[in-house]
Amino acid sequence: MSTALGAFCVQIIRFFEELVDTFPEERDIKLGLEAIQGARKINPKLILDLFYEHVYRDAHEFIEQENDDGLVTYAKAKVNSQFNEMSSALLIFDKHWETMADSNRSAIWKYMKVLCVLCAKAKGLAPLTPSASTPTQTPKA
């Protein structure tokens, strides 16, 4: 397991453990944690691929900007359209974000930002910067 992939797996498990402790009534989060822990033993890259597909690809800009409205809207749509191991984490944005304490929101933003950075690193993606996200034309020969 690559260092970046290993760090990503450790961090996402810690995130889910924190969510289980914070929202013990949410059975889906506990089941998500168990699925991720099992996948880490068998195929850790699967966890990375799920996060990339269901969180990073469409929501990393919301996370980087701490855009509550964008992420809550995305999470609601994702949870309602396609349930998977990442859905249980997105569920907190759908069900609990509005009533959550600022300290919990801050902790979740920090986890999500770190997970996005580790995901990009493990996937070999360029860090997102304004110049990297803006299309440029290459000069014609």
Language-model regions: role of each:
Residues 1-106, 120-134, 138-139:
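Terminal low-complexity "docking" segments
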Residues 110-121:
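Short, hydrophobic/amphipathic alpha-helical patches that form generic packing surfaces
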